[in-house]
């Protein structure tokens, strides 16, 4: 990275910024937090095998169905893998946080006041139909998303004044007001659409045929709703870029769809697909047996990791009147007996989720630090009192299944919230309405973990109905916020990033990421402060912990559990690098061993 003073250079692309007073930073990497790990001349990432062969086929299983190939559509269920058809301007490795290296973009220049940024497009960049990727395509992509993309996109990038092709291979982003995070985000992760393909199509609508992509894999076969097969392109333009060395090692990738997870597991054991990451503790403990295991054809591994954990829970839609009171939400947390479930259903494999930054230094523990208090004290009148006086912990039982003490606490909280028990039915004192709600699910395995909660809620006089729908209906109801409760997960947060705006800020209340429907001025303030302080790691630490505390004590979900290992079973034909990336299992770095494959039954070679 180097700084250069802008001057009048005739026909150079810096002409537009010649009179600016800010310095210009020229670089090949963009890092949201800290310094980039890899130098400008790096050859490959540390967690890949640069000599990995490009060979063989891998098949994965998916639950449900799909009906189109447009990952960006506002309705429908896109095919598995369709989101990877397009390369992004830059690429983020799995062993760093928010650092991006050249892919479609080969070089970046920006003013150090973050009012503008220019990207040079790699002259070799091509779409899968052979046509070059140009700055016009980048300009088109931004405008397409701003006019036809989801509302959250328009809101997130409203500070972007323009994205303009100033040269066939140079695009300039200008901000209406300087904003480092939005400027970098747009430059880093934009997946570039081919203008010649999309200009007469609506981005918001489903796509019945595979689009023209730019990534390493292209759709070569599909049966809508049942399977889709991608093939590695022999003439993929970016195969030798440092970000791709040692990656994309399967010649074909196929996704097959199954009715539910139980059927899919049996198909895996029978040899219908190759790799399965297990989410069910019961299946992992008791179902991975049989002839193919005895013969050594299938390998079962628990791979330990220290990656940040997702925040999984039964999520309340607090836009629903029944869940608008925090006391009601807290009361229901006492109805989940994690200790009994872990012992009797999960074979003691899990730890209890308690944080939105689980397994990171940003997890709020103990009482607020001095720096946290500096942030939180001015907001004291708008924050639950216990943020300042207690460390949050989910309710704990003795694991016996007898939770009378916990239910007594729940009864008291419900009473304080205006509810009373009448003829064994929890009833609102003013309205006379019975306490009932619906848990929306799409998987039988989710129903299994919901039933114990349902039974305990029944003891409180609360009727939780479990409503199972197919994946298409589920996605529609999620987008429409047509649900009372979901069993869902907030993605793992390795650090407090600007993405937290979309997840928690009220400006993005319509985002499907804001599962709970949170609209809280304190949460707004904290997420906006986090977005504004990305250059200051010392400020992000107390801000992240402060946000964690506020979210914890508002009881937006009934916390479930997490696992500090990857549970994965494979038909034993794969090899992987000796180093695993810190933040991912790294399946895109695995390869098929021709020698090992020959030892397997023919359909799994």
Question: Where are the regions that the model predicts?
Answer:
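Surface-exposed binding/hinge segments that line
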Residues: 154-199, 214-223, 368-381, 579
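Extracellular/periplasmic solute-recognition and catalytic clefts
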Residues: 162-165, 220-231, 256-320, 327-331, ...
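Aromatic- and charge-enriched surface segment that lines or borders ligand/interaction sites
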Residues: 48-53, 73-79, 107-151, 166, ...
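Aromatic-rich, solvent-exposed beta-strand/loop patch
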Residues: 102-106, 128, 133, 174-193, ...
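N-terminal lobe/hinge region of extracytoplasmic solute-binding protein
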Residues: 23-113, 120, 143, 212
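Detector for C-terminal structural segments
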Residues: 24-29, 62-64, 77-80, 84, ...
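Gly/Pro-rich hinge or "lid" segments in bacterial periplasmic/extracellular proteins
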Residues: 65, 85-96, 143, 187-247, ...
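A structural "hinge/loop" feature
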Residues: 26, 44, 64-80, 104-106, ...
């Amino acid at each position: 990275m180097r700084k250069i003073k802008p001057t009048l250079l005739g026909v150079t692309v810096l002409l537009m910024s010649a009179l600016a007073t800010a310095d210009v930073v020229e670089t090949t990497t963009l890092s949201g937090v800290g310094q980039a790990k890899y130098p400008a001349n790096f050859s490959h990432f540390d967690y890949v095998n640069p000599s990995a062969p490009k060979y063989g086929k891998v098949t994965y299983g998916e639950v449900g169905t799909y009906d189109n190939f447009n990952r960006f559509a506002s309705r429908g269920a896109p095919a598995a893998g369709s989101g990877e058809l397009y390369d992004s301007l830059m690429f983020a490795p799995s062993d760093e946080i928010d650092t991006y290296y050249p892919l479609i973009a080969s070089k970046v220049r920006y003013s150090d006041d973050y009012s503008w940024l220019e990207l040079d497009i790699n002259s070799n960049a091509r779409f899968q139909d052979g046509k070059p990727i140009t700055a016009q395509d980048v300009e088109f992509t931004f405008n397409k998303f701003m006019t036809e993309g989801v509302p959250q996109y328009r809101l997130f990038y409203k500070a972007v004044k323009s994205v303009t092709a100033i040269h066939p291979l140079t695009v300039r982003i200008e901000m209406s007001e300087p904003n480092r995070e939005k400027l970098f985000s747009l430059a880093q992760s934009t997946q570039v659409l081919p203008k010649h393909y999309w200009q007469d199509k609506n981005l918001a609508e489903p796509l019945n045929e595979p689009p023209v992509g730019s990534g390493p894999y292209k759709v070569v076969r599909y049966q809508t709703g049942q399977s889709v097969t991608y093939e590695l392109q022999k003439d993929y333009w970016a195969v030798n870029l440092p970000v791709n060395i040692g990656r994309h090692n399967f010649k074909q990738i196929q996704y097959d769809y199954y009715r539910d997870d139980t059927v899919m597991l049996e198909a895996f054991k029978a040899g219908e697909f190759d790799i399965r990451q297990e989410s069910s503790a019961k299946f992992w403990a008791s179902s991975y047996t049989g002839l193919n295991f005895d013969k050594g054809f299938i390998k079962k591994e628990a791979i330990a990791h220290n990656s940040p954990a997702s925040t999984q829970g039964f999520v309340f839609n607090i836009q629903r009147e029944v869940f608008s009171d925090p006391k009601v939400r807290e009361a229901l947390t006492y109805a989940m007996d994690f200790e009994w479930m872990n012992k009797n259903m999960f074979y003691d494999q899990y730890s209890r989720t308690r944080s939105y930054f689980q397994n990171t230094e940003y997890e709020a523990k103990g009482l607020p630090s001095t720096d946290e208090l500096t942030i939180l004290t001015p907001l004291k009148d708008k924050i639950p009192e216990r943020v300042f006086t207690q460390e949050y912990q989910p309710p704990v039982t003795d694991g016996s299944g007898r939770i009378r003490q916990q239910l007594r606490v729940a009864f008291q909280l419900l009473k304080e919230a205006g509810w009373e028990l009448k003829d064994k039915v929890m009833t609102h004192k003013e309205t006379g309405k019975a306490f009932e709600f619906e848990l929306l699910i799409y998987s039988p395995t989710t129903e299994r973990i919901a039933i114990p909660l349902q039974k305990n809620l029944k003891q409180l006089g609360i009727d939780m109905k479990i409503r199972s729908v197919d994946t298409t209906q589920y996605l529609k109801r999620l987008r429409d916020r047509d649900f009372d409760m979901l069993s869902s997960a907030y993605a793992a947060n390795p650090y407090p990033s600007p993405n937290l705006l979309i997840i928690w800020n009220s400006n993005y209340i319509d985002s499907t990421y804001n599962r709970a429907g949170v609209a809280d001025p304190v949460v707004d303030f904290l997420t906006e402060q986090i977005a504004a302080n990305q250059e200051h790691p010392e400020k992000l630490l107390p801000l992240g912990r402060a946000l964690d505390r506020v979210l914890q004590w508002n009881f937006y979900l009934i916390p479930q559990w997490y696992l500090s290992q990857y549970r994965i079973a494979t038909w034993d034909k794969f090899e992987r690098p000796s180093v695993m990336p810190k933040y991912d299992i790294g399946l895109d770095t695995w390869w098929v061993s021709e020698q090992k494959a020959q030892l397997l039954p023919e359909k799994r070679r």
